[in-house]
Swiss-Prot record:
It catalyses: tRNA(Ser) + L-serine + ATP = L-seryl-tRNA(Ser) + AMP + diphosphate + H(+); tRNA(Sec) + L-serine + ATP = L-seryl-tRNA(Sec) + AMP + diphosphate + H(+). Its EC number is 6.1.1.11. Catalyzes the attachment of serine to tRNA(Ser). Is also able to aminoacylate tRNA(Sec) with serine, to form the misacylated tRNA L-seryl-tRNA(Sec), which will be further converted into selenocysteinyl-tRNA(Sec). GO terms for cellular component: cytoplasm. GO terms for biological process: selenocysteine biosynthetic process; seryl-tRNA aminoacylation. This is Serine--tRNA ligase.
Length: 425
């Protein structure tokens, strides 16, 4: 959430930065609410000080021998009660304005970093680097074709069980998925991440704190009878691990690695990636998440991206890194690096991880602070996929194709999965 002080005192700065995102927003009304709320807060504070002064005066009068039931003390008490009533009215008005202000602030996206390249769409993203040599051959199968041939997952029965855009992993496919999850978690924990396995049902406050609500309500699955939602990413519950907390500065950075199933309605994606593992309502992902001191966030962004890249490098999967332009940034992000893995069968790079620095945007929504000496300030948060498991499997299937139809797996994965190749069962 954007700092309301910036809305009150420098709305033109917000307007300029949102314009970089391609959004023209008139903040005049929001600034007026912020100033009214601040004015009420100051008036209430003044009244409370007057009330405290009157209360002390009553005590001094009685201590000095005045009759507690006399007219002089009664007049002071009457004055104090009148002040209390005014304070209560101001508190209600201030509460209403604060709620109105927060609701509007929650709908505004994060302000892009000065380092973020300007642009309107994904066409303006900047390629930063590449790793590995993409395999380019004629006649290679796409991952869903390989999966059908090797009976790695079943989509038709999944429609019967649920609906379209679900898969049931079978046999070697299920085993490979489990192996990838364990491989990723082991790799990250070996680098100092603390593994967590959070709830996959989260409340509205958690989704709001991480930035999914109110904007992405239509993208999410919600329980009918409870204030619970199926989490779209482990970023949501991990953000709320420290909601409403003050983290001692000497404990930062906190680095978590979390596996979870993820659930997304994928509204607006009708007709896209209808076959295979690329775009599903339910998928597995290993998430990386950092809580850092504000001075460390840029360095941390480079490191969390490198940690996601390490998975692709360990599996020998060629990829490229894109610095997303302002017009393609996610709602909560200040700056984002996308990792796109090469899919030889499809002949294209596809996103497999987004690594974002969010500044204090999520921390302000979730009231996550740190204390360094006497000073309390908001932490900065970062998140990244490390990695999306289904898309990693898709890349492995297409990259490991052999002339005999088998799929050769990377050597580091063999101890986890128990075999070197995927073959017809």
């Amino acid at each position: 959430m954007i700092d309301q002080r910036l809305v009150r005192d420098n709305p033109e700065v917000i307007a300029q930065q949102l314009k970089r995102r391609g959004k023209s927003i008139d903040l005049t009304g929001l600034q007026l609410i912020a100033r009214q709320q601040r004015g009420l807060e100051e008036e209430r504070s003044t009244l409370q000080a007057d009330g405290n002064r009157v209360g002390k005066e009553v005590g001094l009068k009685i201590k000095g021998g005045a009759d507690p039931n006399g007219e002089e003390v009664a007049a002071l008490r009457q004055q104090g009660n009148a002040i209390k009533q005014k304070v209560a009215v101001f508190e209600e008005e201030e509460k209403a304005l604060s709620s109105q202000l927060r609701d509007q602030l929650l709908s505004l996206p994060n302000l892009p970093s000065p380092l973020c390249p300007d642009g309107k769409s994904e066409d303006d993203n900047v390629e930063v680097r590449r790793w590995g040599t993409p395999r380019i051959e004629e006649g290679l199968e796409e991952h869903w074709q390989i999966a059908q041939r090797l009976n790695l997952f079943d989509t038709e029965r999944s429609v019967r069980i649920a609906q379209s855009r679900f898969v049931t992993l079978m046999g070697q496919g299920a085993r490979l998925e489990r192996a990838l999850i364990n491989f990723m978690l082991d790799l990250h924990t070996s680098k100092g991440y603390r593994e967590v396995m959070p709830p996959v049902l989260v409340n509205t406050a958690s989704l709001t704190g991480s930035g999914q609500l109110p904007k992405f309500a239509e993208e999410s699955f919600r329980c009918a009878d409870d204030d619970l939602w199926l989490t779209p990413t482990a970023e949501v519950p991990v953000t709320s691990l420290h909601r409403d907390e003050i983290i001692p500065a000497d404990q930062l950075p906190l680095r978590y690695s979390a596996y979870s199933p993820c659930f997304r309605r994928e509204a607006g994606s009708y007709g896209r990636d209808t076959r295979g593992l690329i775009r599903l309502h339910q998928f597995n992902k290993v998430e990386l998440y950092w809580f850092v001191h504000p001075d460390q966030s840029e360095e941390a962004h480079q490191q969390i991206t490198a940690d996601a890249e390490a998975v692709l490098q360990a599996l020998d999967l060629p990829y490229r890194v894109l610095d997303l332009c302002t017009g393609d940034l996610g709602f909560s992000a200040q700056r984002t690096y996308d990792l796109e893995v090469w899919l030889p069968g499809a002949g294209a790079f596809r996103e497999i991880s987004s690594c974002s620095v969010c500044g204090d945007f999520q921390a302000r929504r979730s009231a996550i602070r740190t204390k360094d000496g006497k000073q309390t300030k908001l932490v900065h948060t970062l998140n990244g996929s490390g990695l999306a498991v289904g898309r990693t499997m898709a890349a492995l299937l297409e990259t490991g194709q052999q002339p005999d139809g088998s799929i050769l797996l990377p050597k580091p994965l063999v101890p986890y999965v128990g075999f070197e190749r995927l073959q017809p069962e």
